[in-house]
């Protein structure tokens, strides 16, 4: 009987050990992982919200002299919606801001429990998608901002930031925040992809 009890206890211990999650899998379920994910998504929300507010308020009107008529000044406005690239950046920041809010709520729910593998995989795909959107929008808007700052002598495009200083500061700040948002999305992708990698081991 003692032998049977020992064997039964041994088998029960093996079954419990097999049922227990492996250390790599458990590492992805701790609150530290979900906490880091939530913090990055909250930061992404703040950055994209600030970026779209700064860009939406990018407008300035200045009085420009007419060379043909000395003493005559003409009011010329500069707004973000005068450039398709800046409109694209505003839309990208808007949808990314909404996405970060939704995924932050999802991450908040996962703090108290484990994160399903399917959820992590979906987050990786979506983070990659939005990182690509933000990177492309930031790149196109950055090109427009650079031309406004430096001009282009080959195409005779004159710089305007020496005239529309406040407008260009808004554009530059929004482009910088778009770059920060892209980096945050890359970090989120790495974080969730690493967790999936740990679970597969």
UniProtKB/Swiss-Prot annotation:
Gene Ontology cellular component annotations, sorted alphabetically: plasma membrane
Topological region Cytoplasmic: 1-37, 106-118, 192-201
Side Extracellular, residues: 59-84, 140-170
Family annotation (InterPro entries): CASP/CASPL (IPR006459), CASP_dom (IPR006702), CASPL (IPR044173)
Cited Pfam families: CASP_dom
Main location, first listed in the record: membrane
Highest taxon above the source species: Eukaryota
Regions that span the bilayer: 38-58, 85-105, 119-139, 171-191
Keywords from the UniProt entry: Cell membrane, Glycoprotein, Membrane, Transmembrane, Transmembrane helix
Membrane topology: Multi-pass membrane protein
Location(s), subcellular: Cell membrane
Annotated glycosylation sites: 156
Lipoprotein in keyword set: no
NCBIfam families xrefs: A_tha_TIGR01569
Family to which this protein belongs: Belongs to the Casparian strip membrane proteins (CASP) family.
Quaternary structure and interacting proteins, as annotated: Homodimer and heterodimers.
Protein name listed in UniProt: CASP-like protein 1D1
Lineage: Eukaryota, Viridiplantae, Streptophyta, Embryophyta, Tracheophyta
